A protein has these predicted regions:
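Proteins with a high burden of low-complexity, intrinsically disordered sequence enriched in S/T/G/P/A and R
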Residues: 1-2, 28, 189
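Metal-cofactor-binding active-site regions of metalloenzymes
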Residues: 1-19
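Active-site core of metal-dependent hydrolases
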Residues: 15-21, 25-141, 147-148, 152
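His/Asp/Glu-enriched, well-ordered alpha-helical/loop segment
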Residues: 120-189
Length: 189
């Protein structure tokens, strides 16, 4: 609440690169972010970098079970990195949770396919956002899972995803813009 530009927290879960936080620690983190947001008149959100672990969104459901943090303050991102995670994310959104699709993830669920599939499954556009993970680290692993390098994610995939939504998925431009603009603004308050 004291640092002007800080509007919440971000933590990696369900990922081999996370610090493997326990459910109670995650619930406490999300609750502190929520309270800080209330005190500082900010969003007080908790963003979760989702990995490919079979745990999927279980850590977020544990937060909801072990705290009083509203679902509207939790944001799983990178949900299109695997089919099983994306299916779980659609369920999360159908229950009222906001989900974030990463434009820089080429598959297995492309960003434009992810938006289209979510909408076709009944997810409201206002519960979807698309982000680039721009300036985030992009680790490179070999076939054995060894880190071989680290790059930096760019922003160009945002425009590419918007174009694909309109030209490939045949979504009207006004609707295609929502996950990049209005839904993000609403989520961040």
């Amino acid at each position: 609440a004291l640092i002007d530009r800080v509007i919440g927290v971000k933590c990696a879960v369900s990922d081999h690169r996370s610090s493997a936080p326990h459910d109670a620690a995650l619930a406490n983190m999300a609750a502190q972010s929520r309270v800080g947001g209330l005190l500082g008149n900010k969003a007080g959100i908790s963003v979760f970098h989702m990995g490919s672990s079979k745990k999927g969104l279980a850590p977020l459901y544990a937060i909801l079970e072990n705290s009083d943090v509203p679902m509207s303050k939790l944001l799983p991102t990178h949900v299109n990195r695997s089919e099983s995670l994306f299916d779980a994310a659609i369920e999360f959104a159908l229950k009222g949770g906001h989900i974030d699709i990463t434009s820089g993830i080429p598959g297995p669920v492309t960003p434009s396919q992810a938006v289209k599939r979510a909408v076709d499954s009944g997810v409201a556009l206002d519960l979807l956002s698309v982000s680039s993970d721009g300036n985030g680290s992009q680790p490179v692993f070999d076939a054995q899972g060894n880190l071989t390098g680290i790059g930096v994610a760019g922003f160009e995939s945002l425009l590419e995803t918007l174009v694909a939504l309109v030209q490939v998925q045949n979504m009207p431009l006004a609707d295609a813009l929502v996950p990049f603009t209005r839904s993000v603004a609403k989520f961040l308050g």
